[in-house]
C-alpha cells in the first residue's frame, strides 16, 4: 500500500538528511502521512463491519417466518453516562423499523470510533526519546514498502453492566458471554419487570438472607436430602427460585425469621416477633395467591416449594401463619399428579431436574399430610393414593429423604389411622366389636413388629460398619445409620398409637408401658442432637402417654440448651404441659383420650409433623 513517501532505495543519502531542520520537517511530514493512512484503514474496517452487521440483521429478519415484535419493544437505550438510568424506547412503526436498526448500528459504530485507540496517538511525540528514534528511521526498503497491520480496539467486546444484580439468565445472554451493544439492543427479548425468570436482588440485605438460606436454612428444612437418592439439593432449589418470584420471596422471609430465632435463642425466653417479618410474608403470600390462580406444570413445582417454605415458616409463626391452610393447598396440587402416577403413566428413570424436584417436594407434602393427621378427626383424603406409592417395589418417592423415616412406617401409620376411624365410626352407631377391633389391630401389630425387628438389626449392623470401616463411603454409611435410627424411633411411636387406639391411654397398662419404655430407649440411639429436630411427631406421641414420673425428664429435654435453638420442637413443651394438666385434672379421661383433643392451642390450629 502506497503512503506517498518517496523511497530512495540504496542510493546516495538524500540531501534533507542533515540532522537539522530539514530532516525534522521531512520527518513530521512522514508522520502525518502514516497517521492519515492508519485512520483511513480504520475507517474502511468500520465501514465493512457496518455493512456486514446490516446484512446479518437482514438475513436474520427474513429467515424468521414470524418476527418477534417484543424484542423491539423492550429495546434498551444505552445512557450517555453511567449516572443515567436505562430507558425503554417506544416501539417504532413497521415502516421505520429498518431505519431504526440502521441508526442503532450507526450510533454503535460512531461510539466505537470515539473510543478507538490510535496506536500512534498513544505515544507522546514531544518526548525527546521518541523524536530521536523517529529521526533515525531510514526508509531504505524496496519499492513495495507497506504498512504493517494495525490492531484497533472497538467496543464490540465491552460488556454492558447494570447496577442491579439479577438471579436468572436471559435467553441469548449467558454469564461470561459478551454481546455487542447493537446486538444486545435488538435481540434483547425480556423486561426485568415482566419476566418471571429475572429476580432482582434489590439490596444487600436480600443478598445476605439468600446466602443465609442456602448455608443454614436449607439444611434445617431438608436435612436428609443430601443423599443421592433424594434427587434434590441446594442447586435445584436455587434453580426453582430463579423461576419463581413467590418462592424467592417466601424463602427470604423464612430466612429472615430463622436467623432472628437463632439470634434470640440465647435469651431466657426466646421470642420471635412476627411484626418484624410481616411485610416480607405479606408480599410473598400475595404473590403466591396470584400464581396459584393460573399455574402451569413448571409453576406446580415452584408452587410446591413455596408452600413447603410457608409450612416451615408456620413452625416459627404458628400464631400468624396457618400451616394447615398451606398444607391443604399443597395436597390439592399433588392430587392430580398422584392419580397419574398410580396409573403407571410416569417413569422414575432418567428424571429431569423438574421431575426430581417435583417428586421430592411431593414427598414433603405427603409427609406433612400423614403426620399431621394425628390431631385430625379423619385420615388423609389421599390415603389410598399414598398407600399405592409407599408400597411400590420401586417407589419414585422416598420419604426417608424428606423426613429420615422410611416409607413402610408411613404405610403402617395410615393403617393405624384407618383403624382409629373405624373404631370411632362403629362406636358412634353402637356396632363396635372388641373382638373385631383386636383382630384388626393384631394384623397391623404383627407386620409392624416384624419390620421393627428387621430395622433394628440393620441399625446395629450399620453402627458397626461406621465404627470399623473408614473409607470414602463412610458418609454414606453414617447416613444409612441415621435413617435406621429415625425410622426406629417413628416405628416405636406408631406402636404406642396402635395400643392407645385399642386399649385407651392408660400408662400403667403393661402393653402400653412396654411400648413407651421401648420408645424412650430409641431416643438413646440418637448421637446427634440435631436429629431431634425431625422427631417432633414421636416426641408428641410418647410425651402424651408417658407416666407422670417421666414428665420432668421431658421438661428437661425440651428445655435443654442443645434444643433451645430447635425450631421443629418450638412450642412442643407447652402442648405437652397442656396435655398433662388436662389428664391430671380429669378434663380428659384415659378411656376417651384422643390425640385430636390437641389440634388447637391458644385458639389456633397446630400442625404436628
UniProtKB/Swiss-Prot annotation:
Keyword ATP-binding recorded: no
Query: InterPro entries, from UniProt?
Result: Fun_TF
Principal subcellular localisation of the protein: nucleus
Compartments, as annotated in UniProt: Nucleus
> DNA-binding region located at which positions?
1-7
Q: Does the keyword Iron apply?
A: no
Instruction: Please give an example of a GO cellular component term from this record.
Output: nucleus
Q: Where in the sequence does UniProt note compositional bias of the Polar residues kind? A: 51-84
- Low complexity bias located where? 85-97
Pfam families under this entry?
A: Fungal_trans_2
Q: Which UniProt keywords apply?
A: DNA-binding, Metal-binding, Nucleus, Transcription, Transcription regulation, Zinc
Q: Where in this protein does the record put region Disordered?
A: 46-104
Give GO terms for biological process. Answer: positive regulation of transcription by RNA polymerase II
Q: Name one GO molecular function term.
A: DNA-binding transcription factor activity
* Record function comment: Transcription factor; part of the gene cluster that mediates the biosynthesis of meroterpenoids.
Q: Which family does it belong to?
A: Belongs to the TRI10 transcription regulator family.
Q: What is this protein called?
A: Transcription factor ntnD
Q: Which organism is it from?
A: Nectria sp
Amino acid at each position: 500500500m502506497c503512503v506517498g513517501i518517496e523511497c530512495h532505495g540504496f542510493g546516495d543519502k538524500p540531501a534533507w538528511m542533515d540532522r537539522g531542520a530539514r530532516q525534522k520537517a521531512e520527518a513530521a511530514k512522514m508522520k502525518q502521512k502514516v497517521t492519515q493512512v492508519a485512520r483511513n484503514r480504520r475507517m474502511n474496517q468500520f465501514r465493512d463491519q457496518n455493512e456486514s452487521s446490516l446484512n446479518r440483521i437482514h438475513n436474520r429478519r427474513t429467515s424468521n417466518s414470524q418476527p418477534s415484535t417484543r424484542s423491539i419493544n423492550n429495546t434498551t437505550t444505552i445512557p450517555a453516562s453511567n449516572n443515567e438510568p436505562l430507558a425503554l424506547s417506544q416501539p417504532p412503526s413497521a415502516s421505520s423499523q429498518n431505519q431504526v436498526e440502521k441508526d442503532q448500528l450507526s450510533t454503535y459504530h460512531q461510539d466505537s470510533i470515539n473510543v478507538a485507540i490510535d496506536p500512534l496517538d498513544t505515544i507522546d511525540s514531544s518526548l525527546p526519546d521518541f523524536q530521536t528514534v523517529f529521526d533515525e528511521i531510514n526508509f531504505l526498503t524496496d519499492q513495495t514498502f507497506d504498512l504493517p497491520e494495525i490492531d484497533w480496539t472497538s467496543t464490540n467486546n465491552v460488556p454492558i453492566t447494570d447496577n442491579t444484580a439479577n438471579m436468572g439468565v436471559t435467553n441469548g445472554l449467558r454469564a461470561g458471554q459478551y454481546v455487542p451493544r447493537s446486538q444486545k439492543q435488538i435481540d434483547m427479548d425480556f423486561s426485568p419487570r415482566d419476566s418471571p425468570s429475572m429476580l432482582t436482588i434489590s439490596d444487600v440485605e436480600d443478598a445476605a438472607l439468600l446466602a443465609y438460606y442456602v448455608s443454614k436454612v436449607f439444611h434445617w428444612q431438608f436435612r436428609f436430602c443430601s443423599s443421592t437418592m433424594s434427587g434434590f439439593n441446594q442447586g435445584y432449589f436455587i434453580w426453582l427460585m430463579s423461576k419463581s418470584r413467590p418462592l424467592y420471596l417466601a424463602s427470604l422471609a423464612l430466612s429472615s425469621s430463622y436467623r432472628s430465632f437463632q439470634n434470640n435463642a440465647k435469651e431466657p425466653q426466646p421470642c420471635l416477633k412476627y411484626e418484624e417479618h410481616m411485610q416480607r410474608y405479606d408480599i410473598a403470600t400475595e404473590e403466591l395467591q396470584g400464581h396459584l390462580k393460573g399455574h402451569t406444570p413448571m409453576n406446580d413445582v415452584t408452587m410446591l416449594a413455596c408452600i413447603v417454605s410457608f409450612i416451615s415458616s408456620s413452625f416459627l409463626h404458628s400464631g400468624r401463619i396457618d400451616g394447615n391452610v398451606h398444607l391443604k393447598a399443597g395436597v390439592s396440587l399433588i392430587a392430580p399428579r398422584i392419580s397419574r402416577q398410580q396409573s403407571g403413566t410416569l417413569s422414575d428413570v432418567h428424571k429431569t431436574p423438574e421431575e426430581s424436584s417435583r417428586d421430592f417436594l411431593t414427598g414433603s407434602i405427603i409427609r406433612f399430610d400423614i403426620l399431621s393427621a394425628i390431631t385430625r378427626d379423619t385420615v388423609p383424603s389421599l390415603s389410598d393414593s399414598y398407600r399405592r406409592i409407599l408400597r411400590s417395589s420401586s417407589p419414585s418417592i422416598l420419604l426417608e429423604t424428606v423426613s429420615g423415616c422410611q416409607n413402610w412406617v408411613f404405610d403402617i401409620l395410615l393403617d393405624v389411622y384407618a383403624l382409629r376411624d373405624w373404631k370411632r365410626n362403629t362406636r358412634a352407631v353402637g356396632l363396635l366389636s372388641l373382638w373385631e377391633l383386636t383382630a384388626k389391630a393384631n394384623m397391623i401389630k404383627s407386620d409392624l413388629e416384624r419390620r421393627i425387628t428387621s430395622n433394628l438389626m440393620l441399625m446395629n449392623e450399620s453402627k458397626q460398619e461406621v465404627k470399623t470401616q473408614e473409607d470414602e463411603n463412610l458418609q454414606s454409611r453414617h447416613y444409612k445409620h441415621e435413617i435406621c435410627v429415625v425410622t426406629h424411633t417413628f416405628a416405636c411411636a406408631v406402636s404406642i398409637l396402635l395400643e392407645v387406639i385399642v386399649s385407651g391411654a392408660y400408662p400403667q397398662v403393661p402393653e402400653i408401658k412396654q411400648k413407651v419404655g421401648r420408645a424412650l430407649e430409641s431416643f438413646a440411639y440418637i448421637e446427634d442432637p440435631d436429629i431431634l429436630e425431625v422427631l417432633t411427631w414421636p416426641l408428641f406421641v410418647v410425651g402424651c402417654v408417658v407416666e407422670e414420673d417421666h414428665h420432668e425428664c421431658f421438661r428437661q429435654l425440651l428445655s435443654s440448651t442443645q434444643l433451645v435453638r430447635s425450631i421443629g420442637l418450638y412450642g412442643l413443651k407447652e402442648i405437652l404441659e397442656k396435655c398433662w394438666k388436662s389428664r391430671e385434672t380429669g378434663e380428659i379421661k384415659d378411656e376417651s383420650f384422643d390425640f385430636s383433643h390437641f389440634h388447637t392451642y391458644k385458639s389456633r390450629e397446630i400442625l404436628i409433623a
